[in-house]
Amino acid sequence: MATDALKTLLPLAGWSEDHANTVEPSGNFDPILPTPFRIGETSSAALSAVGLAASDLWELRTGRHQDVAVDVRQATASLRSSNYMKMEEAPVSNRRNEVMGVYPAKNGRWSYLHCNFPNHRAAALSVLGVAEDRDAVAKAVAQWDALELEEAIIAAKGAGGMVRTMEEWGQHPQSAAIASLPLLEIVKIGDSPPEKLPEGDRPLSGVRVLDLTRVLAGPTLSLIHI
C-alpha cells in the first residue's frame, strides 16, 4: 500500500501508484517516536522506494520479480542507527557533548545550541561568555533574546538557532529556499560509455557508492542506499 509519503516519490521514478501498492508495510505506525512528525511513514517510504528500485533493476537483469516489504518500526530505527550500534556485542557510546541542547531564552522562547564539533562549541561558549558547563550555559542563554543569540552565534561561525513554530519556519528564507528545490536531483559530472553491471546474485552486486558527505543526514542517506 502506497502511503502519502511514498506517493510523493512516485513521479521521480516514473512509477504508478499500482506499482507502489505492491510494497507490504508491517509493524507499528506513527507515532513511533515522540514527535509530531510522521517519521515512521517517511523513513519507510524512503526504504520502500529503494526496495522498489532494486526490484526493478533485478527484474531488468534477470527477468525475475522480487517482493518488497518494509517494517515501519525497523525503518524508523534505521534513522537512529548510531543509538543501537555495537562493537563486539558491546554498545558504542553515543553521548553528546554536555552543553548541546535546547535552552529557555527570554520572553518564553527557546534556543538550540549545536555543540558536537569543537569549533561550534567554542563559538557558542565565546558568544555566551561562559565555560563548558551546562548550568552556566543555561543561565547565560536565559539572558538572551533567542533571535539575537541565533544571529550572534552564526556571526561567530557557530551552529544554533531560535526554536520556531511551523508557521514561523514557513516564513523563513531558508524554508523558502528548500521548498523550491527538487526532492531528488541527479547531476551528471562527466561523459563516459555505459558499463555493464557486474555479475552477482543481488540487484546491486558489485556496485559501489562513494559517500563524500559529512555529519548526520548525508551518511544516514548513504546507509539507506547500502
Over which residues does each language-model region extend?
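Acyl-CoA thioester-binding alpha/beta core of soluble enzymes
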Residues: M1-I224
